[in-house]
């Protein structure tokens, strides 16, 4: 893949974090976690839920569903 293309996953999580959009994270075992994304790296997502932090490993995540649409444009996906 071309290095000028940014990681869509990172753009999505970063916008959710910056805009403080509540998300529901569905794990592969069916558990639902709700909260605000506080941070993330290549392997984990930190979720704040009612003042409690949870470190969730990305390999355990099935789906991330935001409470409202996360807007981004092609300029965030492609470097010019």
Curated annotation (Swiss-Prot):
Keywords: RNA-binding, Stress response. Disulfide bonds: none annotated. One of its GO terms (cellular component) is cytosol. One of its GO terms (molecular function) is RNA binding. PANTHER family: RNA-BINDING PROTEIN HFQ. RNA chaperone that binds small regulatory RNA (sRNAs) and mRNAs to facilitate mRNA translational regulation in response to envelope stress, environmental stress and changes in metabolite concentrations. Also binds with high specificity to tRNAs. Belongs to the Hfq family. This is RNA-binding protein Hfq. It comes from Clostridium perfringens (strain SM101 / Type A). The lineage of its organism: Bacteria, Bacillati, Bacillota, Clostridia, Eubacteriales.
């Amino acid at each position: 893949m071309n290095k000028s293309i940014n990681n869509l996953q990172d753009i999505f999580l970063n916008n959710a974090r910056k805009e403080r959009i509540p998300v529901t994270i569905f794990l592969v075992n069916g558990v639902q976690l709700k909260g605000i994304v506080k941070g993330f790296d290549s392997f984990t997502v930190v979720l704040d839920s009612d003042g409690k932090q949870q470190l969730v490993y990305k390999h355990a995540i099935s789906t991330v569903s935001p409470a409202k649409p996360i807007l981004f444009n092609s300029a965030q996906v492609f470097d010019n």
